[in-house]
Each structure stands twice: as structure tokens, then as C-alpha cells.
A protein has these predicted regions:
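Hydrophobic anchor at the beta1->P-loop junction of P-loop NTPases
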Residues: 5
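ATP-dependent NMP and nucleoside kinases share a basic, alpha-helical "lid"
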Residues: 70-73, 79-138
Length: 204
């Protein structure tokens, strides 16, 4: 089973991908962050430059993950991905009209990506602003990230309505570092039960 986790910047995608991957013990494919990406990408995102190049870069990154998964997927497995074709489409909202046609051509990279579920995370801007400030990344300007989140989140909500296997989950009040938050996601997305590792009280 393949599950894509998508949403605007600062929503908690990377955390949820890692946490659910660990919970299911089947692996997860994140998009990474600073240190993984080409150093020019973050600067171009912050400055609103090179929209087609940025979009193509993330499309190629996601595509590498999907190609690698093909050799690891199997019946009974649940594999989580950060990002999907809908991600590339949602981010188009932050770029000018003159770039839209070129951006649409880049979308073709994601035509072969398939999922059993797409979890679309959304939340209030207050929650996102809190998470952005908590992660305290020096290369992120909180006000700009919140502005971008509003644009991208609105696009995700609209796009999700046309995806037959998308489930929109409002993450306000959900903590992805707590079992209760992860269980809420599993239930809302109708994912199969994860295997429990038994914990026992044992005498010395």
C-alpha cells in the first residue's frame, strides 16, 4: 500500500512521514530538507525565483523516491511518501501567470505516480506559524512561510476534492509525536492497523 502525505509548508509532513514509517516498520520516503537539497533551491524559494526549476527539482526528487519504492513495495506493506503530483500542482499557486504553462509541462513527471491514499494535511495559520517558529530554521522567514502556506493550503483543499483517494485531515490539536495523534491519522485515512511490538513486564 502506498500513502502520500501532502500539505503546505510547515504543516508537519516530514514529521508524519517519519513517525508513521517507524510505526509501520515498512519505510518512508521524505523529501528531505536543508542539507539534502541543492543549496540554491532554498534561496530561490525564499526569493520567488526560478519557479519552473524549483518545481522540476522536487518532481525529480519525488520521482526518484517512487522508482526506488517499486523494488521495495509488496503485499502487506504500507509505505509513506512525502509529496505527490497534487503537491506540484498546489505550489503553482505561488508563482506568476507567465510561468503556469511551463509549470504544467513539469507536472507530467508525476503522471505515473500512484497511491492507495493521499493524506492532505491542513490547519489554521496559527498552528502553522507556531510550528514554523518552533522549528527555528534560520533560513525561513516566518511571515513569508505563513503567506506561502495560505496560498498553497487553499490550492490543496481545492485540488483534493477531485482526487478520488484523497482524505483532507485538519491537524489542529494533533501531535505527531504522540501515539494518539498518529492513531487519529490512521483512523481518519482508513489505513490498515500497524503491527504492535509487544511490551511486557518481565521479572528479573
Amino acid at each position: 500500500m502506498r500513502v502520500a502525505i501532502v500539505g503546505g509548508p510547515g504543516i508537519g509532513k516530514s514529521t508524519l512521514v517519519r513517525q508513521l514509517g517507524d510505526l509501520y516498520h515498512n519505510g518512508a520516503y521524505g523529501e528531505g530538507e536543508k542539507g539534502v537539497w541543492d543549496p540554491r533551491v532554498l534561496d530561490d524559494i525564499a526569493q520567488g525565483r526560478n519557479p519552473v526549476g524549483v518545481t522540476e527539482y522536487f518532481a525529480a526528487l519525488y520521482d526518484a523516491n517512487y522508482r526506488d519504492c517499486a523494488s521495495n513495495d509488496a503485499p502487506g506493506k504500507v509505505i509513506f511518501f512525502e509529496g505527490a503530483r497534487i503537491t506540484l500542482e498546489a505550489h503553482m499557486a505561488e508563482y506568476p501567470a507567465e510561468c503556469q504553462e511551463s509549470l504544467r509541462r513539469v507536472l507530467a513527471i508525476g503522471d505515473s505516480w500512484t497511491f492507495d491514499r493521499i493524506i492532505v494535511l491542513t490547519s489554521s495559520t496559527a498552528t502553522v506559524e507556531k510550528h514554523i517558529k518552533l522549528r527555528n530554521r534560520p533560513y525561513e522567514v516566518a511571515e513569508n512561510m505563513v503567506r506561502r502556506f495560505r496560498l498553497i493550503d487553499a490550492a490543496f483543499r481545492q485540488l483534493a476534492s477531485r482526487e478520488h483517494n484523497a482524505i483532507v485531515i485538519d491537524r489542529d490539536g494533533m501531535e505527531f509525536h504522540e501515539r494518539s495523534g498518529l492513531d487519529a491519522i490512521v483512523q481518519a485515512a482508513a489505513l490498515p492497523k500497524y503491527p504492535e511490538i509487544p511490551y511486557r513486564d518481565l521479572a528479573c
